[in-house]
Amino acid sequence: MEDRSGFWQVLQQLAPGTALREGLESILLARTGSLIVVGDSPEVLALVDGGFRLDCEFTPTRLYELAKMDGAIILTRDAQRILYANAMLVPDPSIPTSETGTRHRTAERVARQTGELVISISQRRDLITLYKGPMKYILRDFAVVLTKANQALQTLEKYKLVRDQAVARLSALELDDMVSALDVALVVQRTEMLLRIGKEIERYIVELGTEGRLVAMQLEELLAGVAAEGLLIIRDYASTDDPQHAAALRQQMAEWTYEELQDLAAVARLLGAGALDSPLGARGYRMLRRIPRLPAAVIENLVARFGRLQRVLAASLEELDDVEGIGEVRARAIQEGLRRMRMQFALERQL
């Protein structure tokens, strides 16, 4: 499939536990084969020749029984009603197709010509193939998808450990004012890789339907706070700390290929940094967010006032107290929070 993201809504409609999936599985088990169009646009209806109009409520049993006839079945786009059965579809024969069987060739041409979802169930190969526009996708067995989802979760867990270690190292370097562009690029790159693995698992969850709840819970736990922290790191080091600019950089990186993402120098350039060994200073958004009960508005005021995390670390109680939204109690809490973090990372480094 060229673009899986375009199939998300389709996969939700066909997920295990849905009425449409139940009907498709029944046809597959019976080995009758079928051609089903999920869409009643004028473009689809113009291709219908013969058959008979039903316009009845959809049920898995009705779909299964109607599939015993040779012709195509036409459903409404929401798959709530069966419009036609035993129909012949006559798409433009000049539309190119890579398929060999008559049913699959017709399905691909109808999908390309109308842009609607067309489902072809093979009589011999036990396969359900989806076509939508130029895209093709073979619907996988539940057990296969679940196995792949669990494997991806294991990969995600291992990669998160590596990424968390890089983040901890960056935190220690920020407090000691020893950060290089390489340190930042490595964390930004690993965060993006982690989010990409998460996107892949989300696709599996969609395919699993109601059976994917456990996988979804594990994914949510593993990725909790990762995306938000990643944006804060970008705001800490990008040429400008505007949140929209950080989001735009994240989106730009999301469009890179895997090979492009491996180039740490390119990641550093995206952030506006120079050579990988060039020193950088954090603005402090991420580290200040770790201080308990410190509102986001106060963090914005701190960065606007001091500009760099090191200046916040060096600030006196009086200087902190002068910042809008910070009184003496909060100023002490900021100093104490930063002191504890410095001790924590120093201890972790010794271990």
Curated annotation (Swiss-Prot):
Q: Residues in domain DAC?
A: 4-142
Q: Quick check: keyword Methyltransferase in the entry? A: no
The prosthetic group or cofactor this protein requires is: Mg(2+)
SUPFAM superfamilies the record matches: RuvA domain 2-like, YojJ-like
GO molecular-function term, one example from the UniProt record = hydrolase activity
Gene3D superfamilies in the cross-refs: 5' to 3' exonuclease, C-terminal subdomain (1.10.150.20), DNA integrity scanning linker region (1.20.1260.110), DNA integrity scanning protein, DisA, N-terminal domain (3.40.1700.10)
UniProt GO BP:
DNA repair
EC number(s) from the headed UniProt entry: 2.7.7.85
Q: Does the keyword Nucleotide-binding apply?
A: yes
Name the InterPro entries for this protein. DisA, DisA_sf, DNA_integrity_DisA_N_sf, DNA_integrity_scan_DisA_link, DNA_integrity_scan_DisA_N, DNA_integrity_scanning_protein, HhH_motif, RuvA_2-like
What reaction does this enzyme carry out catalytically? 2 ATP = 3',3'-c-di-AMP + 2 diphosphate
Q: Where is the signal peptide?
A: none
Q: What keywords is this UniProt entry annotated with? A: ATP-binding, DNA damage, DNA repair, DNA-binding, Magnesium, Nucleotide-binding, Nucleotidyltransferase, Transferase
Q: How does it assemble?
A: Homooctamer.
NCBIfam families reported for this sequence: PRK13482.1
Summary of the function given for this chain in its UniProt record:
Participates in a DNA-damage check-point that is active prior to asymmetric division when DNA is damaged. DisA forms globular foci that rapidly scan along the chromosomes during sporulation, searching for lesions. When a lesion is present, DisA pauses at the lesion site. This triggers a cellular response that culminates in a temporary block in sporulation initiation. Also has diadenylate cyclase activity, catalyzing the condensation of 2 ATP molecules into cyclic di-AMP (c-di-AMP). c-di-AMP acts as a signaling molecule that couples DNA integrity with progression of sporulation. The rise in c-di-AMP level generated by DisA while scanning the chromosome, operates as a positive signal that advances sporulation; upon encountering a lesion, the DisA focus arrests at the damaged site and halts c-di-AMP synthesis.
Q: Could you identify this protein by its name?
A: DNA integrity scanning protein DisA
State the species of origin.
Answer: Symbiobacterium thermophilum (strain DSM 24528 / JCM 14929 / IAM 14863 / T)
